[in-house]
Amino acid sequence: MPAYRSRTTTHGRNMAGARGLWRATGMKDSDFGKPIIAVVNSFTQFVPGHVHLKDLGQLVAREIEAAGGVAKEFNTIAVDDGIAMGHDGMLYSLPSRELIADSVEYMVNAHCADAMVCISNCDKITPGMLMASLRLNIPTVFVSGGPMEAGKVVLHGKQHALDLVDAMVAAADDKISDEDVKVIERSACPTCGSCSGMFTANSMNCLTEALGLSLPGNGSTLATHADRKRLFVEAGHLIVDLARRYYEQDDVKALPRTIASKQAFENAMALDIAMGGSTNTVLHILAAAHEGEVDFTMADIDALSRRVPCLSKVAPAKSDVHMEDVHRAGGIMSILGELDKGGLLNRDCPTVHAETLGDAIDRWDITRTTSDTVRDFYRAAPGGIPTQVAFSQEARWDELDTDRQNGVIRSVEHPFSKDGGLAVLKGNLAVDGCIVKTAGVDESILKFSGPARVFESQDASVKAILANEIKAGDVVVIRYEGPKGGPGMQEMLYPTSYLKSKGLGKACALITDGRFSGGTSGLSIGHVSPEAANGGTIGLVREGDIIDIDIPNRTISLRVGEAELAARRAEQDARGWRPTEVRKRNVTTALKAYAAFATSADRGAVRDLDAR
């Protein structure tokens, strides 16, 4: 029987000093021997997805203590990718994932916590905490802050649903007036919560449901809705039960590595492909699998992408559909339910809240449940009132969206497309693979060939796009923006948004060893591996080279002969794999430390301590 980890600091004569310090935090004699649960919060006033989390940590703590545990809260950092976008701040976003994972490990191991509740929400926070949970392998429940309500605005007599990306695109569109841009800006992000589309934050919070590490509704219940409070309350009680199951009954099904098995990762990736999740999720899923010592690779993702159809399209792929609409259609459990009906899911994986994922789907899928409580839960609607307060409204939809032929969630028999929402491409330009969000690609450009327009940085590409130097048919190549070359693997939301604003969203391609925001749409191919800084072929592309992209056949090729590529490689080896232009970029010691150990995207951009 495993001993409670916390006994290291709470039992024995030699721990008198430690107990004295615990007492100074409020613990009493009766608390020693109870499971000590870390409440890992990520409250910050910098990030709208986290502004409402301040009191939620203590809400969970109270429920933990009511259930017989001892709760101790601490905070991690949280970077807002939208605010950090378009300047050197974006260099810090992906590295913050590792910093978050490390800080959770430091706090939990230093104080010998027995289990943890992870209160996350936005882009790198959920992945960082997920990596930590699999690294530590102690009982863990995830509960996120929830999605933002979609913005609503009336322009020229017509109502539009909005999100952050709409504001960025409008600002770069010369045809939209300053006044309309101001209206869109003020309406795009009306409430607290993670940005309202199927961007990275919401994608990752949805995937925790498929992995079995969070409660049903975690990915889709609005941050503002009173129903979301139940998730926090239940998480507090559930984590104490999981801790007791493991430490007192030796039940390994309470541990993250048992729950998040290879089969669970296959479920999560199947969901990601079916819902057209952010391409960033591929990075994070690979990194989490690495931490859990799960043999899950790009090859597994490629295999899944060839057989899992696209069952849902949400902004940015479908601009008028947001997370509130996914929830009304039954949320993640209903997408999983459709995958289950199609034989595309592993039903037997355990979860933190049900014996198996199959049991959970049978109860929580609105098309098969017999529970009025479950159906009412998914009727939770946006309140339509700007606020930064959690659980502040109780609006309900009159009806659920159960239309599986034409609704927000489709059946396997009536998919948006038979090919899934994400695809892995390979070829001489990306020997180890690259990723495209096919759910956001217009059917007319699934096969595309064009001349390369080569840029050594995101900034240089943006200047060219805004100066109207990019023409229909071009392939924009942005390199030396990978994990090592950036460093930090910046998101390319501004280049893709500006292409869209220039009317080139369906007329150009963009290829990079960097990555894309979950808000990106169009023929945007990222994570090219190996990256340029690691000797990848993308570093050999020259202005005017023809690049061929074939999504149906999963290929991406540089139309240059092997002899010429060999000559270019020898030349590049001699000069070093670095940008040909000097970049005005402040690469600090912290970023240099990250770059020293960063791997390319096909490995999840994890650190390789044997790399030096």
UniProtKB/Swiss-Prot annotation:
Residues binding [2Fe-2S] cluster, per UniProt: C122, C195
Similarity section: Belongs to the IlvD/Edd family.
Catalytic activity: (2R)-2,3-dihydroxy-3-methylbutanoate = 3-methyl-2-oxobutanoate + H2O; (2R,3R)-2,3-dihydroxy-3-methylpentanoate = (S)-3-methyl-2-oxopentanoate + H2O
Organism: Rhizobium etli (strain ATCC 51251 / DSM 11541 / JCM 21823 / NBRC 15573 / CFN 42)
Subunit and interaction comment: Homodimer.
Sites bearing N6-carboxylysine, chain numbering: K124
HAMAP family: IlvD
Record pathway: Amino-acid biosynthesis; L-isoleucine biosynthesis; L-isoleucine from 2-oxobutanoate: step 3/4; Amino-acid biosynthesis; L-valine biosynthesis; L-valine from pyruvate: step 3/4
Protein name: Dihydroxy-acid dehydratase
Function field: Functions in the biosynthesis of branched-chain amino acids. Catalyzes the dehydration of (2R,3R)-2,3-dihydroxy-3-methylpentanoate (2,3-dihydroxy-3-methylvalerate) into 2-oxo-3-methylpentanoate (2-oxo-3-methylvalerate) and of (2R)-2,3-dihydroxy-3-methylbutanoate (2,3-dihydroxyisovalerate) into 2-oxo-3-methylbutanoate (2-oxoisovalerate), the penultimate precursor to L-isoleucine and L-valine, respectively.
Requisite cofactors: [2Fe-2S] cluster; Mg(2+)
Catalytic site positions: S517 (proton acceptor)
UniProt cross-references to PANTHER family, sorted A to Z: D-XYLONATE DEHYDRATASE (PTHR43661), D-XYLONATE DEHYDRATASE YAGF-RELATED (PTHR43661:SF3)
Record keywords, A-Z: 2Fe-2S, Amino-acid biosynthesis, Branched-chain amino acid biosynthesis, Iron, Iron-sulfur, Lyase, Magnesium, Metal-binding
EC number(s) on file: 4.2.1.9
